[in-house]
Amino acid sequence: MQADFLPLPLWNRQLCAGSGVPLPCNAPSAVCSGHRCGVVQRRGEAVGQLDEGMAVAAEVIEALLRGADVPTVIDADGINFLASHIDVLKEMQAPAALTPHPMELSRLTGCGVEEINRNRVHTARAFTAEYGCYLLLKGSRTVIAAPDGRVRITVSGCSALAKGGSGDVLAGVVGALAAQGYDLFDALTVGAFLHGRAGEQLAVRFGAHGALPSQLPEEIGRLLG
């Protein structure tokens, strides 16, 4: 199975939204055509948090989300976009899953991080019921919620995963599982478990501080092999 990318030439800080980089009018269909799952995130610096990239990033993400006709995993700048365009979730035609950490979910809900962490299951369940999506709320015990009220809590994971880039791997694993036919609830569950177990194994070999997110894909491959 091959992963295809729709790169944007604005990861460089010196490029800005006014530089005339248009979103191809067929971008959503180009990304979705012939594919079984989409992942909306970013690689490297969160371009949606930069003034010069925000407008273009928002245009790209909105077009992809509204045009998606395959299950979609929304992470990083996809979540940043939804913080000010939350109703797009209700208008999506395909199933969607969000993978926020508590601070990102705080931006989406207006609830404080402490309140979210005190009521993780309730918050996740209420969000998915309101917006009709799936949610993976990251944390020491990741909570996975479905819009029909089902909730699962992972039993794998460790502090080795609390690093930038770890969540990108998780979103990719979930997307890969969904592309192979898992429904999003199961893809989130299996993906979170594999991600957490891989982190545990790496922490044993390299220590929690020495383990790197870039080592996770290979370790997940070992677990599956």
Which residue ranges define each predicted feature?
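Glycine-rich phosphate/dinucleotide-binding loop and adjoining beta-alpha-beta core of small-molecule
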Residues: 1-156
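A short structural micro-motif
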Residues: 115, 194-197
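Charged C-terminal helix
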Residues: 197-225
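Short pre-catalytic strand/loop immediately N-terminal to key active-site residues, enriched for Gly-Thr
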Residues: 153-165
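Short, small-residue alpha-helix embedded
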Residues: 107, 163-194
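Feature representing long, continuous alpha-helical segments
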Residues: 122, 152, 171-172, 185, ...
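Short, charged, surface-exposed loops that flank catalytic or proteolytic processing sites
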Residues: 110-120, 181-189, 207-209
